[in-house]
């Protein structure tokens, strides 16, 4: 598994914790709760994702609400929200990964942490955001 993939998995878990139990961000970013060995660059990338999501969460959540047709925001699982948040952050604020790769990675993370049905939902929301909110890479 790539370092970036590991970082995204850690970020999903951190965002899940933040949503579920609302601990201090500083404590979550120490990753004492994560029991696997990680490299410094994996932790650093996970920290940058989580910090970016937290900083921009209001705008990100507005987009989730706008594009999750027929879904009340409160009914979206915490895991799906975490994956959507980190993926929308990547789509809007980072440029090192192609947009379609970001969406593919989100779908794979959703399959890993949730289900095929959830993966279709996440893919649909992200695809709609990409088509309607983000200028093309070309």
Swiss-Prot record:
CDD domains: Terminator_NusB
Keywords, in A-Z order: RNA-binding, Transcription, Transcription antitermination, Transcription regulation
GO cellular component: cytosol
Pfam families in the cross-refs: NusB
InterPro entries documented for this protein: NusB-like_sf, NusB_fam, NusB_RsmB_TIM44
GO molecular function: RNA binding
Superkingdom of origin organism: Bacteria
Entry keyword Disulfide bond: no
UniProt-listed GO biological process terms: DNA-templated transcription termination; transcription antitermination
Function comment: Involved in transcription antitermination. Required for transcription of ribosomal RNA (rRNA) genes. Binds specifically to the boxA antiterminator sequence of the ribosomal RNA (rrn) operons.
Family of the protein in this entry: Belongs to the NusB family.
Designated name of the protein: Transcription antitermination protein NusB
Organism of origin: Leptospira interrogans serogroup Icterohaemorrhagiae serovar Lai (strain 56601)
């Amino acid at each position: 598994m790539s370092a970036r993939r590991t970082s995204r998995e850690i970020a999903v878990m951190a965002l899940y914790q933040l949503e579920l139990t609302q601990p201090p961000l500083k404590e979550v970013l120490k990753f004492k709760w994560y029991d696997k060995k990680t490299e410094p660059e994996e932790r650093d990338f996970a920290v940058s994702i989580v910090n970016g999501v937290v900083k921009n969460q209001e705008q990100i959540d507005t987009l989730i609400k706008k594009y999750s047709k027929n879904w009340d925001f409160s009914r979206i699982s915490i895991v799906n929200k975490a994956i959507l948040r980190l993926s929308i952050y990547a789509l809007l604020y980072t440029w090192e990964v192609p947009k379609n790769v970001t969406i593919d990675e989100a779908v794979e993370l959703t399959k890993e942490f949730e289900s095929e049905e959830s993966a279709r939902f996440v893919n649909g929301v992200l695809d709609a955001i990409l088509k309607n909110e983000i200028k093309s890479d070309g």
